[in-house]
Amino acid sequence: MGSEEDSLEFTRSGIERRQQLVQLAREGDLSLAREFFSDDDPRVRASSIAVLSENDALDESLIALGLSDRHPLVRMSMARAAAQNSSISVLTLLSDEDPAVVEIACWAAGEQTERNDSIIEVLSGIALEHDDALCRESAVAALGALGDVRGLESILEATQDIATVRRRAVIALAPFEGQAVTDALQLALSDRDWQVRQAAEDLTKYLSE
């Protein structure tokens, strides 16, 4: 019973610290956000990252700490921050062992709009080979957002994945053109999943306007 009470108290204490750092940040004081970056509660550390990122106050040392944090909640917060901060390496996050981190990192990669070979290659690998369907879906969406022809083949292959990934892959074809794209859309128009068919119909109509 004692451990349960300790856990409850720890949770309450963590919530209070998060509230404190957020309130001070609203007043322009980031001191607690920096102090709590090494807090014992991962939710507090994650909140520190979010607050510092919103205030453009994540320096190289803090970024390094966040990327190597042992808890996925913290690395997830880093992935969200990466969407608006190109100093945060999405490549590191894309190779994370936790699928939730990878999913967010894929989204961040699409938001960063960096189109180097490594990003395209890693996203393509996730889109086709990751065990988690949400990661594959997020990677396909990122490749579509980047609109780089080097990612097109992976998007086309993803149109043969499970329904949720197929739908995302069809939408991701929007920036591209060519016979392969036309053929993929034509095939999607008769897909067994109605949402895939709808996505293909909408995109076909859009491209013909």
What are these regions (language model features)?
Residues 11-15, 42-43, 70-73, 99-100, ...:
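Alpha-helix N-cap/helix-start positions at coil->helix boundaries
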Residues 17-20, 48, 78, 105, ...:
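Conserved hydrophobic register position within alpha-solenoid helical repeats
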Residues 19, 42-54, 72-80:
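Non-membrane alpha-helical segments in proteins
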Residues 92-114:
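Hydrophobic, well-structured mid-protein blocks that either form specific transmembrane helices
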Residues 103-108, 125, 131-141:
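Histidine/lysine/aspartate-rich catalytic loop segments that bind and position anionic ligands
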Residues 163, 169-209:
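Long, ordered, amphipathic alpha-helical scaffolds
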